[in-house]
Amino acid sequence: TDTFIWEYAKAREYVLVSKDNDFRQRSFQFGAPPKVVWLHVGNATTSVILRLLRESQRDILRFVQQPEAAMLVLGLKDLP
């Protein structure tokens, strides 16, 4: 369930990467941890999502290193 995943990630200080709007809402409601990278990509293919994650690597690393940051939104507009 979403609650189990959230609590598991929180206890281990993981970063969740998801297209699921429920995790975006949880991030707004509870903040971090865990941090959430929310993929606003609709029905994008796996290869498009992989490209987005690779192209956004610097932004993701910067986000993870910011203690006050709870959520990073990545979308297709972020692709060159």
For the regions a protein language model found, what residue spans apply to each?
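Acidic, PIN/NYN-like endoribonuclease modules and their adjacent C-terminal/linker elements
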Residues: T3-W6, Q25-P80
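Acidic, metal-binding active-site segment of PIN/NYN-like and related structure-specific nucleases
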Residues: A9-S27
